C-alpha cells in the first residue's frame, strides 16, 4: 500500500500526534 501524505497526516493527527510523514513508503507519526 502506497503511503499518501494527506491520509497519513490526518490519521496521525486524529491519534493526537502533531503530524505524519511518509518515509520509505510507510506512515510515520511525529509527536513534535
Swiss-Prot record:
Tyrosine amide carried by residues: 32
UniProt site positions, description: Basic residue of the functional dyad: 21
PROSITE patterns reported in the protein's UniProt record: SCORP_SHORT_TOXIN
Keywords of the record: Amidation, Disulfide bond, Ion channel impairing toxin, Neurotoxin, Potassium channel impairing toxin, Secreted, Toxin, Voltage-gated potassium channel impairing toxin
Known tissue expression: Expressed by the venom gland.
Function as written in the Swiss-Prot or TrEMBL entry: Blocks Shaker B potassium-channels (Kv1.1/KCNA1 sub-family).
Organism, as annotated: Centruroides noxius
Keyword Secreted found: yes
Superkingdom of source: Eukaryota
Site (Aromatic residue of the functional dyad): 30
Protein name listed in UniProt: Potassium channel toxin alpha-KTx 10.2
Disulfide links within the chain: 3-22, 8-12, 27-29
Subcellular location: Secreted
This protein's domain notes: Has the structural arrangement of an alpha-helix connected to antiparallel beta-sheets by disulfide bonds (CS-alpha/beta).
Family: Belongs to the short scorpion toxin superfamily. Potassium channel inhibitor family. Alpha-KTx 10 subfamily.
Keyword Secreted: yes
Any single GO CC term annotated in Swiss-Prot or TrEMBL for this entry: extracellular region
GO molecular-function terms, A-Z: potassium channel regulator activity; toxin activity
Amino acid at each position: 500500500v502506497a503511503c499518501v501524505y494527506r491520509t497519513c497526516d490526518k490519521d496521525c493527527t486524529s491519534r493526537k500526534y502533531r503530524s505524519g510523514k511518509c518515509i520509505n513508503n510507510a506512515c510515520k507519526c511525529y509527536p513534535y
